[in-house]
Amino acid sequence: MAEAFGVAGNVIGIVSLGIQITQGLLKYYESWKDQDNDISNMCASLDSLSETLKILSKTIHPPARFDDTTKDSVEKNVNRTDGAVGKLKGELGKIQDTEPIQSGVRSTMRRHVRRALYPFIEETLSKIKRFVSEARQNLDFALQVLQVFASQRFASTGTQGLG
């Protein structure tokens, strides 16, 4: 069985970007966690997605080696996740200061009001939940592929040792 040298660099980049984005969203929304059960659940989902991305990052980071089929499947699923990560990045951009900081009480108040009201828009919470769910489904499949690969490798190594 031919072995590939891990997964493509763009896959590692997608995973790293996903970690940064989920951590940014999580940091912002955790401050609102006690305000509403929906936000608390969303924080738990973001945290879970972030942890899944971290585990995947450790698993696929070089010098990890996989056969071509495993490598292709993992790359395909992580690339599908890129769309959801991009959408989450858009949501993160909405809560970060997007306009140049201007001096003055009025500008400061407008920025604070915008940031304070944003998490409570129900549609926004639903969108983020959908994006997180989409990303988790693809990542879960990628992790399952890696688990099957590891199990097969362990089984073949164990069988060779018995003979």
Predicted regions and their residues:
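N-terminal amphipathic alpha-helical segments
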Residues: 1-73, 88-95, 106, 113, ...
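Amphipathic alpha-helical bundle/coiled-coil segments
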Residues: 78, 122, 132-133
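Short, well-ordered alpha-helical segments
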Residues: 99-108
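Individual transmembrane alpha-helices with interfacial aromatic-anchor signatures
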Residues: 113-127
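A hydrophobic membrane-anchoring alpha-helix module
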Residues: 126-144
